[in-house]
Amino acid sequence: MDTKMTEREKMTKGLMYDPGDEELCKGRTEARQLIHRFNNSMDKLERKDITKQLFGSTGEKIYLEPTLRVDYGYNIHVGENFYANFGAIFLDICPITIGKNAMLAPNVQLYSATHPIDPTERNSGLEFGKPITIGDNAWIGGGAIILPGVTLGDNVVVGSGAVVTRSFGSNVVIAGNPAKVIKEIPVKSE
């Protein structure tokens, strides 16, 4: 029995993989074709349909503004009532999972892709990634950058321009470069 993983399987699991693999090149090309249609459509229902084809999973109520950029799309999972403003970038070589009622302001960048620190390894052309997870009710401010391996809990607010280099729990406002907790968010009981 052959248990050899494909480059796509390695990529999605966060292992070193070859981005020049034929299947991965085809996946990026297919994603770019869908993105081109999305970014040039004036019809919001058509854009929603394209998003549902492109993303791995979505809630029913989603809205994304053009322009949108992704690597593959199939590693992006967004919950119900998701909104992304203009210029969202998803480098989705590993899963990017976003909960329900989440909002991305303009030019938010989510990078699950990374490269080896060692120059010899980096020059080999192999890459790897780390998943990004964002909880329910998150609001990511304009121009924020979320780096590989970050997990943000529920009800997190990320200030505009923040560079999020590490994970944070629920109910906090974070901002800065690198991002740090600015304040805790009191949660009202229902």
Swiss-Prot record:
Species of the source: Dictyostelium discoideum (Social amoeba)
SMART domains according to UniProt: Mac (SM01266)
GO MF annotation terms: acetyltransferase activity; O-acyltransferase activity
Pfam (any one): Mac
PANTHER family per UniProt: ACETYLTRANSFERASE C18B11.09C-RELATED, SIALIC ACID SYNTHASE-RELATED
EC number assigned by the record: 2.3.1.-
Family in the record: Belongs to the transferase hexapeptide repeat family.
Upper classification of the organism: Eukaryota, Amoebozoa, Evosea, Eumycetozoa, Dictyostelia
Top-level enzyme category: transferase
Identification of the protein by name: Putative acetyltransferase DDB_G0275913
InterPro entries for this protein: Hexapep (IPR001451), Hexapeptide_acetyltransf (IPR051159), Mac_dom (IPR024688), Trimer_LpxA-like_sf (IPR011004)
Entry keywords, A to Z: Acyltransferase, Transferase
